[in-house]
Structures are given as structure tokens and as C-alpha cells.
Amino acid sequence: MKTSNLRRGALMCGAAVTMALGAPTWALAQTAGTVDELVVTGSRVSEASVAIGTDQATATVAITREALLSAPAGVTGLKMLESLPGFNVQANDALGMYEFGNSVSVRAFNFQQIGFLLDNIPMGRSDQFGGSPIYRYVDNENLLRVTASAGSGDVGLPSYASLGPIVSYLTQVPDKEFGGVVSYSRGSDNLQRTFARLDLGEHNGFSGYVSGSWIHGDLWRGPGDIDRKHYEGKLRWEIGEGAITFQTVHNDYFDYDSPSITKAQYAGTAGDLFGRSGRDFAYLGYVPVLPVTSPGITYSNTAYNQYYKQAVNSRQDHLYGLTYETPIGGALNLTLGGYYESKEGYGVSPEAYATSLTNYNNERLIIPGLFAPKGLQYGLSTVDGTRQGVTAKLTWNLGVHALSAGVWLENDDYHRTQQRYNQVGGSPDGAPLLNEPVHLQRNYTSTRDTVEFFVKDTLSLLDERLHIDLGFKSLSVDYNIQGYRNPADFIASRRPSISKTWEDNFLPQVGAVFDVNSRDQIFASYSENMALPRGADDIFSAASPAAPGPEAETSTNWEIGYRANRPTFNASIVAYQTSFENRLQAFAAVVPGSSTTETFYQNVGAVKAHGAEFSGQWKPEFLGGKVYFNSNLSYNIAEFQDNFATFAIAGKRVPDFPEWLWTGGVTFEPVEGAVFNLSARHISSRFTNFVNSEETDGYTIYNAYLDLGDGFGAGPFEQIKARVNVDNILDEDYLGTVSTTTNTPASFRPGPRRTIQFTLSAEF
């Protein structure tokens, strides 16, 4: 590291300490006489050099701990991304807790094309069924930083899901002093959350912490509740200049669903049988009395599927990680990691009597032990599996070269079943009769064996003013699915085994960072990526075994940008062009080598996006260091490049990708121990289908928080704080998450109404 960077880092650390004690940062600068070297931010704004990605060759931004702790207690790590430039995050509720209500898009990519890591442990795929979505694995209170690269993450980060974007979650190391924190939150919709963490302190190089959080609340839309129990732990043993770290996460989650609705249902023009409309459109909290549609079957009416107890989700996830870091000599550093994950869970969805009767008749003469349907069916899907892997990375500083190389190996085994069962009396409120299967739909196992390695060289030239990254990675994923993938497999008495390998041995990444001076940088990058096809299990379950598997989606990403890090402001602006090829789409076509027409997933073309992103923070001196501003602005045009089947979509906008995204906020620290923030988030209109025949309006929501007690202690507690968070202050009524379609009206999840949360915390 250059001497100037060391000096700048030391001054910034000093500034952070002073802010924590309540003294204005600008006063420190004047006293020390080093205002030219000091970057001024605020105690609730991310550290400047981290926030704008200083020294990174790609557009990399971050949320540091100070900003994370200002969010509502219990907010998911995924929803926090909405404060970063370019990330269109939609959530079904204010905390982002409901898993099937979350969506993310950035540049040309969606949630399943983004790579997520926790302390360098790859999260694999983000599917709610069988995947490892990041929001199950973190509590905000334990995070040190969330770093996101919207275009292309570093070539050394392991992921088979990413077509470029990478989001990395880094947790805290255990505190060297014994202590802890407890907090309790109450909020709208009967929300209650408790968090507790105990740091064990350091003893002969050993340190560690354990934490737990317990959250319970009602759905804001309709009957039902959410319940989550979450535990984390970390042990660290420092050995000389190296360290061994063990960490674990356990998550137990249960919730009821809420329905997606069309614009017609939202507007009340769909002729809903129960008179529902607007954003409060929900499942029923009672069993209605409906006309019988099949003689002798009391609960044969299809509308009985609107009872809320027929739509639930439950997940249990366990993750264990072990990391060993050590220097080897004076120039080499080795990092070894291993992890193991196990999961299980289930989901319930209803099936109408008429549908179940047809499926029962199709299978009853082939599969023994089936029972005729009695009414509404209990649809049970179960998931279980394990994921295990190892990572290794070696870095070597050799003159102007900083060399690194590494490997990642992973095995992912996943098992899924799906059956329909009778319920007592056929009633939607009857207990499930798991000894009376009506028909079978799935019982398969899928595996993914991944091998990835990378090599990278960072050259420091021109007296360390120019840094050039030259690297590449090789990725290979062997996939297999075997068993009963769909009802047709049961009917045909077949248990196919289908395999496919996706690999690319040369995926380059090139980047450069040039220091114009000690405050300004220019950066640029180019990268190529390949990813496991999104929803691979669904792809290979959609048709007969004769249908061919698709090629992997691939991408290219170009970026060029500028960063400024000044005494009273910092900013980053980047222009980009990104695309991905071999886009996947299901449609009817003749299966190659036969005359049979089937609907199966095929590679149908490309998506390209271009645009610009700005991120900045400003703390003007003329306001006495008590007020600071932050803002992100993104402009993005994402378009289809090719038609498919009979749909002329070339040149059409990709649905759910807004053209404009803006977030901004102002933070006011009037006195020591008090922080007030007001922020806004605007998303422009979005198309909702491929042919662009429908769109949903843009919206702006305002949020605020008041934090009191910073620096206040009493009795055994070093710090006692109170925080109030208000989300959607003006109670904006809008449609958020979109379930896109090809050429028909889409379905939506309404955005949550105004919510208020109170949190009291104490540290000891």
C-alpha cells in the first residue's frame, strides 16, 4: 500500500473514533491542520473509501456497519440492497421477510443471476425451493459490511449463479472484550423482535460470540403470521499472524402466504367472488359457504382454495464454515475454507377437486395405494439436501506483481417431493390425511458438482499510480437429475436420469485503476461470465427426457468510471454496457430428432443493457458538520435483442427493469447522541410483460428514523439507545414485486403500507 493511502486510512480511522465520541469531524481536521487529507462523512453514512469502492477496478459500492444499524431491526440483508445504485429491490413487506415476495434486478440481470457470498462462502442458487437465499443466513447486527458489484465481481469470488453481479456479506470478528448487546423491538402488525449477542472476550488467542434473534408478527395483508428463529456463532483462534475461524448459522422459518394479484383484482374490476380489491386483497381467514360444483362433494368448489391455511412455508437451514488464514514467509498468504450446509422444509398449496380427480384417474391404475379425492386437496411439497465445499486461495507479492490463484469445489445434493393428499371431510380447514395420497407429482434428486479456479495478477505501475488487473477463471458444473420429475414420469413408470455439463475454461476479467491524484481515480473493466441455467430443476422437469437441455447463459460486462474522495464529499459515477446470451425461455416446439411437439426451455437470444450509475455523499462545512446528504441515481435501458417463437420482442424493454432509480437522504445530528434521517426512494414505471403491452406506474416512498442515546450509558450498560423507524411515511399505495409474463397481464404483490417500529437496545 502506498504511504499516502496509509496516512489517509489512519486519518479516516481517527475521524471515525472522534465521530463515535460525538465530536464534529471538521473540528478535528482544523486542529490537526490536515483538512486536505481527511474525508468527512457522518456517523450514519458508510465510510467514504468503502462506499465508493476506492482502488477497485469495477464499480463496487458498499454499506458499512454504521449504515446497516440504522435500518429497521430485522430487515433482511437482501432488502438493504435497495440503498445501493442500480439495485431494484421489491419486497412484499417492510422487512423483506416473506421469501416468495422478494425480487431484485440490476442492469440486465435478476435475482437468480446474482452471486451471493457470506464470509467468502458461496450461497449457491437463490431459489426459495431448495436454494440458499442470503436472507436466511444473516442478522444485520452481526454484519460488518455489505459490498456489491453491480457489473462484475472480482474474478476470485466463487459463484456459479452470477452472470457478473456479486454481493458479498462480511460478518464481524469476535470482540476482544467480554460484553454483549440486547435489543427489543415492537412495531406495526404486532411485530415483536428480540436480539441478543454475547461476546466471550479474548483468552490466549481465543475469542468468539453467539447471538440469537426471535421475530414474530402478523401478515400486513390478510390472516396468518410470520415466525423466525435465527442463531449465529463464531469462534476465532489467532495463531501467530494467522487465524482459524469457525462459524455457524441456524435458521428456522415459518410463514403464511399472501396472494399475487392482477391489476384487475387490484382495481376491483375482476368480479371477485368475495368482493376483494386494492392492496389489502388477501386470502380468506374463514371457510366460506359456496355452491357445490360436483354432486355429493361438499368442498368441490374451486374457490375454496382461497382459505389462508392452504398456503404456508417452512424452512430449516444450517450452515457451518471453517477458515484458516496464514502467511507463508514474507510474501505469501494462504487462505483455506470449508463449509457444510443442510436444509429441510415444506410448502403447502391447495388443489381443486376437479383437478385432483383428473390426476387421480390418470394415475390410479398405475400407482397402488391412491385414494379418491374428497374435496379440496392438501398439496404438500418437501425439500431437503446438503451442500458442501472447499475453497483455497494463495496470494503472492512479487515486486510490482500481486499474484493470486485459487480453487473452489462444491457438491450440492437436493431432494424434492410433491404430492396431493386428502383432508378430513375434504374441508380446507380439515387436518391433512398424509396416509391418503390422491396423486403423486414429484420425487426426484438433483446434484450439482462444481469446479472453479482462477488466476489473477495485479500490476502496480507508474509509481503505483496505475493498477492493472489481469485474470481469468474456469468454471465447470456437472448436473444430474433423476427420479420422478413430473406426473408424466409416474404415469409412464419411468425414473429417468438426465445429465448435462456446462463449462468454460477461459472467462477473462481485465481492469485498471489510475490515480489522477491523491483524491481522484479513473477505472475501467471488462469481464466474461457463465452461469448455471436459472431454475435448472424446473428446466429439466418441464418436458419428456427426450427434450434437450439448454446451453448455459453467458455475459459480457464493460465499465468505465470516475471516483472522487474529497474533504467534504465523495462520489462515484460509472457508465456501462452489459449483455447476456443464451437467454432461456419455455415455449412449444418440435423436440429435435422426433415429430413430437412439447413445451420446454430453449435458448432464445440475448438481452443487452446500457446506462450509468452515480453514488455520492456530501457533508458541507457551512452547516457546521451537523448535516450530511447521500444520493444514488441510476439510468438503465435493458432490451431484448431477439424474437422467439411467434413473439416479436426484439427491441422491447425487459419487464421489471425501471429506466430510473433514485435514492437520497439527509441526516441531521443536532446534538451529541441524536441522529435524524429522512430518505426517499423513487422507481420509474416498469413494463410487466415481454411484448410491453402492460406497465405499472412508478412510485416514490419516504422513510425516516430517529436514533437517540448514542454515547449514553447507565449502570452496567455502556450504551443505551432508542430508535424509531417509519417506512412509507406518506402511505404510498403501489404495486411492487412483478411476476412477469410473455404477452398477458402480469400479477403483482402490493407494496407494504406505512409501518412504524420502536427499538430499545443496550450494550454491556
Task: Identify the role of each PLM range.
Residues 400, 461-465, 568-570, 575-580, ...:
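Gram-negative outer-membrane beta-barrel transporters
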Residues 104, 122-150, 170, 264-266, ...:
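Short acidic/polar hinge/loop motifs at secondary-structure boundaries
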Residues 36, 137-181:
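A beta-strand signature from Gram-negative outer-membrane beta-barrel systems
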Residues 150, 165-200, 210-222, 679:
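Short strand-turn segments of transmembrane beta-barrel domains in outer membranes
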Residues 4, 530, 576, 581-582, ...:
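C-terminal beta-signal and adjacent terminal beta-strands/loops
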Residues 78-122:
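Extracytoplasmic beta-strand/coil segments of soluble accessory domains associated
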Residues 236, 243-321, 348-379, 431-434:
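Acidic/polar loop-and-plug regions of large Gram-negative outer-membrane beta-barrel proteins
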Residues 37-72, 103, 126, 148:
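N-terminal periplasmic "start-of-domain" segments of outer-membrane beta-barrel proteins
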